[in-house]
Amino acid sequence: MKTKRLVLLSGLSGIGKSRIVQLYAKALGAESNLNFISVSPSWTDDTDLLGFPDTLNNVYRPGDSGLVNTLIKASNDQDNIYIICFDEMNLARVEHYFSQFLSVLEMEDRKILKLYNSDLEHRFYNSEQYPSQIKIGQNILFVGTVNVDETTYHFSDKVLDRSNVIELEIKEFSELLEFGKQKNIEKLKTIREQIGEFPITATTFNSFSNNDREMALSKSDLELLWEIHKVLQKASKKFGIGTRVVKHIDQYLKNIPEGAPITKEDGIDLQIAQRVLTKLRGVEEVMRELVGNYDEQTKTVTGSLLIEKLDNSNYNFTRSKKMIEQKAKELSHNGFAI
C-alpha cells in the first residue's frame, strides 16, 4: 500500500479479503473514510463508475458508487487518509470501467481525473460541487478484492502491470484459537504508541514510504530479472518484464521496513510471483517449456526453464516455484494454464 499502486487481494470466497481491508483502515484510524464499492457485472465503461455529464439538463450526474463524492472529499481533506475498495473487482472487465484510473494511477505527481470537458463547467449548475477535474492526492489508497471462478473475468496485462496481486492462503483452522488474544491487541497498542498519533495522518503515512533514488535491486538481481525476461520473450512476445515492473519491484523492496518478518529474499520472491508469474497463462505449446512437466506420481516438476533460472540464483524462491508448479499442474490436467 505504501508504494501507492493498486493492490489486489485474491483468494477463495470467504477467506477474509474484505475483512483485511477493514482492519487496515481501522489500524490507520480511517474507518470513516473507507468506501466499499460493490462492482456490478453490468459495468461496461467508466460512466458506470464515475457518472456522466447530462448536457440536456446542464448537470453532472455522479455514479451510484459514491466514488466521485469520496474523491472530492479526499481532495478537500488532504490531511486524512481515504481508502477506496472495489469489492469483487473482476465481476466486470476492469480495463473497461477502470480505464481512466489505470492511466491516472501510473502518473507520479500530477494525478488528475477528468469527469467531463472543462468547457462545460460554466454551463453546469452543479459544477462547484462536481468540477470537471479532480486531483487524486497522496492521501488516497486503492485496493480491490478478487475472486477467481466461472463468474469473473481474468485481468489483462494492462491491469496486472500496474498492480500488486496478493494471493491469500487459508491458515490451519486450529490457528483461529490464537486470533483476538490479548497479546495481539497489546501489540497494536504498542505500534500506535511508537507512531505517536492516532488516527494516522496522510503526512505521517506518506513519511513511511522510502522514495530514495538509489536502487534496492542489486546488479545480480537485475541480471536475474533480465534472464527471466529473455526466457519469457522466447516463449511468446506477449510475455516479459517491462521497465515499469522492474521499477515497481524496486520500490516494493525499498519499502520493506527494517526488522520486518519479510526479508529482501522474501520480497523478490513475492514480487516475481505477484508481478511476473500472474501474467503467465496460455496453451501447452506456449507454456510447456516455461513451467515444465508435472509428474503426478512424484508431485514434482521437471524441465522448467523458469525454475532453472531461479535455481541459478542465491535465493530460494519458494513461492515463485510453488506458483510455477501449480501452472504446470494446470497444464497437465487441462492443456492450458490460467
Each language-model region and where it sits:
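C-terminal regulatory/interaction module of P-loop NTP-utilizing enzymes
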Residues: 1-338
